[in-house]
């Protein structure tokens, strides 16, 4: 399940941080079925135009995007009791790739909720490339429902998420590790972790973009299209024997997908995740389209 994969990844990041900290000196502190309201008109220039203008560095593009992003439809429904998330993910597990479709409803008041998971058979080997055909297969897969009592479905980071970029970066990865080769990877893992675990409002999305702008080795690829056919702005982070690609919505600043390939002794796919839907609902049985 995606929750398990995220928990494992978070624990792995924590272990890595602990091992690295032991060898370095501390540094300075550094919706329901209701029709969503229309998005707020964007400022001029548009986010996409500002971020894709020629001659800009990747950090400049991300900061421009952070300063000009528009409201997402679900920003207007945050008063509803449940945060809803729908993802599809391909994740390395030793020598196989697991394939999962996850729908999650979290009651924000007490962190109770429900998850519905569909799984496809694991794929042996690490050279697997996710395909659109696999996405269609999820619809016919069996479902597993898991219910969580109060306190059992915690978000990646405690709410409310910081909107100060320095504070958010410190929550995602210890500042003391800023000089370590793994630090950029830890930061981008943290950004993916919050994007695939909890709803980010406009200010919080802007903060994550500013965190990415400060990630060493950040690169820009231009427009890219993910496995769900959505086009966004492609950014990459290369660090610690891996390369991670993020595709970001050019108007709202939402992370649409994340794809990590690792190199070294066991090269291949590490993870690929599509964030298909995110928003808020009145119950833990409704989706944004209104279908259960």
Task: List where the protein language model places each region.
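C-terminal motif of bacterial Sec signal peptides marking the signal peptidase cleavage site
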Residues: 20-23
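Intrinsically disordered, low-complexity prosegments and terminal tails associated
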Residues: 25-292
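N-terminal export and membrane-targeting signals
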Residues: 1-16
């Amino acid at each position: 399940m995606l929750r398990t994969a995220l928990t494992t990844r978070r624990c792995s990041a924590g272990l890595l941080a602990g091992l690295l900290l032991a060898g370095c000196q501390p540094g300075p502190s550094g919706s329901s079925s209701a029709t969503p309201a229309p998005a707020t008109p964007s400022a001029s220039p548009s986010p996409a135009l500002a971020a894709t203008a020629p001659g800009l560095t990747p950090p400049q593009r991300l900061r421009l995007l952070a300063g000009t992003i528009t409201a997402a439809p679900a920003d207007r429904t945050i008063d509803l009791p449940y945060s809803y998330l729908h993802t599809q993910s391909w994740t390395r597990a030793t020598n196989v790739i697991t394939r999962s479709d996850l729908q999650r409803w979290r009651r924000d008041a007490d962190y109770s909720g429900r998850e519905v998971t569909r799984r496809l058979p694991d794929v042996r080997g690490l050279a697997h490339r996710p395909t659109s055909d696999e996405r269609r297969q999820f619809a016919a897969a069996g479902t597993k429902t898991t219910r969580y009592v109060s306190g059992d479905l915690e978000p990646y980071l405690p709410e409310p998420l910081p909107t100060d970029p320095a504070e958010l970066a410190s929550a995602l990865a210890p500042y003391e590790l800023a000089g370590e080769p793994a630090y950029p990877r830890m930061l981008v893992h943290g950004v993916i972790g919050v994007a695939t675990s909890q709803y980010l409002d406009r200010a919080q999305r802007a903060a994550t973009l500013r965190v990415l702008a400060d990630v060493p080795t950040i690169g820009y690829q231009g427009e890219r299209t993910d496995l769900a056919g959505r086009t966004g702005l492609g950014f990459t982070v290369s660090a610690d024997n891996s390369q991670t690609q993020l595709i970001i919505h050019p108007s709202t600043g939402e992370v649409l997908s994340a794809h990590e390939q690792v190199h070294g002794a066991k090269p291949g796919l590490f993870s690929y995740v599509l964030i298909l839907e995110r928003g808020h609902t009145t119950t833990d049985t409704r989706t944004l389209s209104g279908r259960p």
